Design a protein with these regions (language model features):
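Basic, glycine/lysine-rich polyanion-binding surfaces/domains
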Residues: 1-168
Length: 168
């Protein structure tokens, strides 16, 4: 029986030094000449789910309480939950099990292979972001983690600020 080969949509021109195979994804762990950052990290191999339900308050996927208001986020047990609107939450399994399957309940859609997921981390991240979008990641009214739904370099996407320090 042949195995599925999954390929990330992210291609960087640097040479991989260390790679790992995870659930049929070739994951680069380290690149030659990485430097001090900031870093663009490909998380496309991490399981991602869309959850839609008219009563999201009654659902606790992966044992976490979902955020109540659109734009709010919860990072708990390695799962990032982004409240999109009244009836929709995006779920990102960031550091849990690689093979975390889709919950066996109605309302869940696996979007892992139909979406791209990257993280921009390190010092000076926000100085890069301000050149690519008009969204205010340092808005004093917003407490991290929080979600923006908007264009980033003209690409519609979800943008999550996990902290405002920019170096953590």
């Amino acid at each position: 029986m042949k195995e599925i080969q999954r390929v990330s949509p992210v291609v960087l021109k640097s040479t991989p030094v260390k790679t790992e195979k995870r659930d049929n994804w070739e994951v680069v762990m380290e690149y030659h000449g990485e430097g001090d950052g900031p870093f663009l990290v490909d998380l496309s191999h991490r399981p991602r789910f869309d959850l839609q339900d008219s009563n999201l308050a009654a659902i606790k996927p992966f044992g976490i309480v979902l955020p109540e208001k659109p734009g709010d986020c919860v990072l708990e047990k390695g799962v990032l939950a982004n409240r999109m609107n009244r009836t929709q939450v995006s779920l990102y399994n960031l550091n849990g099990q690689d093979n975390a399957g889709i919950p066996d309940e109605p309302g869940f859609t696996d979007v892992t292979e139909s979406t791209l997921c990257v993280a921009l981390i390190g010092k000076n991240v926000f100085s890069i972001c301000e050149k690519l979008t008009a969204l205010d990641f340092m808005d004093k009214q917003r407490k991290a983690p929080f979600l923006f739904q908007g264009p980033f370099s003209h690409v519609p996407c979800q943008l999550v600020t996990l902290n405002k320090a920019g170096d953590k």
